[in-house]
Amino acid sequence: MRFSIEYIDWELSPCDPAYDFVGKDLPTANEELTTVPVIRVFGLNEEAETVCCFIHNVFPYIYVEYSSFAETLDLEVPDFLSQLQTSINYALALAARANPETYKPAVQSVQLVKGIPFYGYSFCFQKFLKICLFSPKNRDRLVDLFRQGAILNKVIQVYESHLPYLLQFMVDHNLYGCAPIDLDDSIIKRDDLLSFCNVEVHVSPNAILNACWLSERNIHTDLYETHASSPNSLLVTSLAEIWKSEASRRNLTSSDETNSFSKLHQSQFGLKEESSHEPRSSQHWKNEVAMKDLLKNLIKSKLESSSDVNTPLIFDPWPELPTIYSAIHTKDYVRPSQNDISVSQISVDEKICTSYESLPKIQLEQNTAPVIESSFEQLDSELERILGDTLFDSFPYVEPNVDRSKFPKSPLNSSQEVTIHSSQDRQSPPSSPLKDVPSQINPFSPSLRLKGGSPITKREIEFCRDLPNRPTSSEPNQGDTRKAGKRLKYSRNLDDYHICTQIPEDYSPKFLSQHESFVYKQQPPSTDDLYGTMKKLKIPFSIPTNVHYSSEKDIPSYSQEYLGKSHYPIGVSSRYLPEFQSDGSVSEKVRLNPLKLSNFHGERTWQYIKPAPLAVDLSNLESKEAVSEEIQSPQRLSRSKVFRKDPYSCVRILALELFCCSHGGLTPDPTKDSIECCFWAYQEDVNSSMIDRVGFIVVDKSASNSSFGRSFPSCTVLVVNSELELINEVIGLNRQLDPTIVCGYEVHNSSWGYLIERASYRFNYDLPEQLSRLKCTSKANFAKKENAWKYTTTSSINIVGRHVLNIWRILRGEVNLLNYSLENVVLNIFKKQTPYYNQADKVHLWQSSRFHEKQILLNYMLNRTRYCLEILSACAIVTKIREQARIIGIDFMSVISRGSQFKVESIMFRIAKPENYIFPSPSAKQVAEQNALEALPLVMEPKSDLYNNPVVVLDFQSLYPSIIIAYNLCYSTCLGPVKIVNGKVKLGFMFHSSNPNIVNLIKNDVYISPNGYAYVKENVRKSLLAKMLEELIETRNMVKRGMKDCDSDYVNKVLNSRQLALKLIANVTYGYTSASFSGRMPCSEIADTIVETGREILSYSLEYINTLDFCHAKVVYGDTDSLFVELPGATKEQAFDIGQQLANNITSRFPSPIRLKFEKIYFPCFLLAKKRYVGFKFESVSQKAPIFEAKGIETVRRDGTPVQQQLLRRCLEILFKTKDLSTVKKEFQNVCYQIMSGNVPVMDFCFSKEVRLEKYKELSTAPPGAVMARRLMTKDPRREPQYGERVPYLIIAAAPGTTLANRSVAPEEFLSSSFSQLDINYYINNSLIPPLDRFLNLLGASAQSWYHEMPKPRTSLKLTETVKGGIQKKTLDTFLMEKLCSSCLKNNIEIIPDKINSLCSDCLKNPCATISKAVTQHNAYNKKLSLLFDICRGCSKLSSSDPVLCKSNSCKVYYDRAKTENYAKVQAEMLTKTLGSLDW
């Protein structure tokens, strides 16, 4: 039986003798044995049926050091194990404040095993006690008791307690999330099913066949450890599956599955870019000699003080004991008798146990992960090894052992043809005027080895060099005797010279004496000669344009000093040009012998050497090409990219949205507002972009299914009579469709969260239990804010058997947006607008008597529900999560809810378990007490300036992972410091001591890091971290190479998801060692070694580049793993050549796989400060148009406004293209003018910053967005923003001294109030000018001065709209409007007794012109408003009679419409006043 692991959790259930085997000497079932853990796995089989599997007899366990207390007890091992077991039960009973005599047993078994400590180099096995428990809940409690010394009065170090129960199970049995689990025939099916799944089984862990793919690697049998795995094998099973899948896709399959992997593996190694003929050297550190001396002295002193110098080395003192790996799969749990130990004999610290309840609780971790070894043979595949899939794409597909005569001959673009023969089936070379020249190529240096350390075999490759113009058919063409020549010929049409001659390449003209001609005695210099002279004289090849002013009036009359540098403004007129330096002398030779030019004239033309083809020739050529394509089609078919789709990837997903009818336009409240309609969308396969079914359930007593069905023929419509029926129908729909994933755009305050809260409050209904896949469960719940971590990171809704996705929160990690509303996400992903209706408008549509308006609401909600699934599909969110779960080995939900350390451990444990390594589990106190991190990466402070010369960006690829691999760094290879301080050797959170005899034997195979720590080299013990990272990096390179020739969107999504998962794990491995606050197994010394080594590598590279003379390169900035190198006077083409040369030279100076990659050039660019730069990016020589790229500045930051981003980017682009400050000034002043004139959309002024209301102690210290949200919540409590939600707000003008928080308003508040005005001065002076001035000040210019000197537009006053009750807002504008003429807005009104007048005397004298003006303005605004309404109706797919209710904050048309609507109302009031004043 086989099915995928889509969902996994556990629960405690009563012991059932039919399934559970708890061990020997336990009370019988009649005595009510304690509950036992049962793991529940939900998945899909190949027939897409849902499967529920209950796995019994899997118990959580921890390890403790046997040597910590065993030697102090005068007991035999069985007796000691019994006493320890009884002591643990007694201590747990006291900690639980229960009676020890009646407390149910908590320990399932205690077993003595052996393993290799992972934390620090250890060469021999040590004893450990494996303690299995009945409940995972007791594990953390027991760990605390051990650490406090409450058991046997001994403080004991605990091992592997930080590995959660489910992850422990998945690692032990080689299981991976979203990957198949294989079961044997020993499965049990019962009649009374516990779930709603199609298939339900009960199994024991022995039935899981995945564990059979693992095998123990006995590598700890010698001082110089052997590698038990095959050279081509992978230690992580999930990575081996990726290689097999890619081999199948590239058609490298064979009858033997392992051969397919081997072919691809050898192909990948042949394509490794760091392969070279010469071995790469290892750079010596500055303090290396001193460190080696310290190590020698340390060994000498320890040997002198040691008494067991001649003690023989024993690597396995207890061969009879099971290893930790073999103990995992022991079927019979050996349980010592506990009848002989009385309670009075137990040594337990009761004070510690009874006070346990006062200790801080440690949250249980319930997650999982996986890894495996596969062994493969090495095949002979020279073609794929050398060529891969990307070279010689224009050639017919060639493979080893294929008859070359089957392929048609065709002319080559190149003058050479490469033919590669397999070493086993090399045919005799064809007859050719040139002989085959064998050439041995070794693409691997001695330092580059495959898995296991075996060197890669050399192969012979034969190259056949044919003639340049070889025949184009299979038979030799004897009639073609043309020689190679130029494509064009040159002739002169003279009276006596009409012959056109073909010029061979080696032709040199020899003029006869009777012809009058001039030949230079000295040939002109070639381009190479000129370049050489320029290099010698240090003349720049390119002189960049300096920053200047194109307009004389813009040039300031003074110089500006900034950062200690004086800037003198320059223009483009002649007075700014440097004077020409010359003494006016003329060469004597030129003066006496002037050059005489020939009076020889003639007409010159160019003619093609070969005439144009005739139509007949073209038709013959087409027929030949057609035949050629028919011949090549089988080969092309064999090269087609076939990707076998995962049969378990068809995960079903259900999206749900609700409409609730609230009062007063408030956000729906589940305690008050009933659910009127439920909308759903269903997708059978998340990999498909098609939505299979949509529908809705509506509460309407007066309507029927047919009335709604006629309007929505493509939807599944169901009309119910009550809200309770609606909830029951949702439950029925959920069970019928049986989705693995349920989702909503926001699932806490709406969607599933609202549905659950409403059912609980109104009907006292436990909806999560009904929605689960189990008939009865206690783990389904909606804790909301009780589980703070899930509430703020994923979803706090727990439905057993199904995953709940909170889409908007997942999108925060996928796309960088200023606002994560559904409308803005759709706009940025699909590039189209979607309407937004507020709650009041939705209620209005629902309560309308017109069914058509109800239909508008239903269509609106259905579209929003569809978008939930379309967004998931477009961003490939589910595919990314599933691929990451399959690679890392954790369950689906842990991918988005757990941190990087949890994911690293999943892979580390999978490699460590078969090698019998055992990991310590530090307490929070131990982590805090380890040595502080000392090393810092090298981050230079750049010289802030504009760099007009090309700046080459060099980046060390995966520097920290490469350092770990190159220098064999790991916990298990660290010997400790070479210098001991205070006689103590502390490694991370533990004290570590190395055997001086062992260190003395391997002293020549030790690497000493720059921070003074010693590590054994690879030939002694291969670093486990290096093993893991090698496989991750090699697999990612292979996947990325496969993406280049992938033409399927689905396959590209899968491959991209895989390489992202691999990249994530490789990049966070260093962080796992350096997590000094929340670390699960940190080691500050190893982290310092990695950082210090990286610092030394970057420092050496910096010094090497700065000392070069041939290119005058200068490092202007460096950051951790990258270098910015300025090349003065170089052209763009030269910059690419020099950059590649620098990268190759530096790469050769460090051991593999450390590689410096030439990434790009910036030309030109600004360097502002650390991690803040911007420039025009070029990634290839052929790239014509530059790409604007910025890091750390306002154009990419999200704490500003869109208008700020747009202005800064526009000015920088102009500056980079023209170097003209006058043009930049004009653009800046134009934008400021448009802003002050009110021509910039209001949405471009919105700030959108994250709000976390629970984090602010006082409202007075909260940011403006939080203050505004609090103010809105006083009116609408359910409008509370989600944790981390970006809340948009505007800054309006107010009285001087008003705080920014009190001037912040929501966009809808601003638009609904015609008297509010944006604080334009704040936006210009505080938002636009400062970021721009940071660049302009470097050039001697100032945007602040440009703004002060520009003319400011006068804004005309607009009559403010009256509010209810006729009361107007008494702003300065309204006061002036009361005194000014409503028509001309210039003169004061004419006061007429006993009459209300709003016109001045001039306008009263000319009533026709006054009325005409008022009517014209009124009609103009109405016409514009009508046009905007038509645009909105078209976007919302409404008819001309439908109301436009859209209020999308992501649409510029909405802001324009709202502004025009306000102006239209103002003009209507002005027209009414004007007509009233004229008695109309």
Swiss-Prot record:
It is found in: Mitochondrion; Nucleus. One of its GO terms (cellular component) is zeta DNA polymerase complex. One of its GO terms (molecular function) is DNA-directed DNA polymerase activity. Zn(2+) binds at residues 1381, 1384, 1400, 1403. Residues 403-488 are annotated as: Disordered. It is an enzyme of class 2 (transferase). Its EC number is 2.7.7.7. A zinc finger (CysA-type) spans 1381-1403. Residues 411-427, 470-479 have a biased composition (Polar residues). Its main location: mitochondrion. It catalyses: DNA(n) + a 2'-deoxyribonucleoside 5'-triphosphate = DNA(n+1) + diphosphate. Residues 457-468 have a biased composition (Basic and acidic residues). Gene3D superfamilies: DNA polymerase family B, C-terminal domain, DNA Polymerase, chain B, domain 1, Helix hairpin bin, Palm domain of DNA polymerase, Ribonuclease H-like superfamily/Ribonuclease H. Binds 1 [4Fe-4S] cluster. Its cofactor is [4Fe-4S] cluster. One of its GO terms (biological process) is error-free translesion synthesis. Keywords: 4Fe-4S, DNA damage, DNA repair, DNA replication, DNA-binding, DNA-directed DNA polymerase, Iron, Iron-sulfur, Metal-binding, Mitochondrion, Nucleotidyltransferase, Nucleus, Transferase, Zinc, Zinc-finger. [4Fe-4S] cluster binds at residues 1432, 1435, 1446, 1451. The CysB motif binds 1 4Fe-4S cluster and is required for the formation of polymerase complexes. Nonessential DNA polymerase. Required for DNA damage induced mutagenesis. Involved in DNA repair, mitochondrial DNA repair and translesion synthesis. Has a role in the bypass of abasic (AP) sites. Belongs to the DNA polymerase type-B family. Forms DNA polymerase zeta with rev7. This is DNA polymerase zeta catalytic subunit. The gene is rev3.
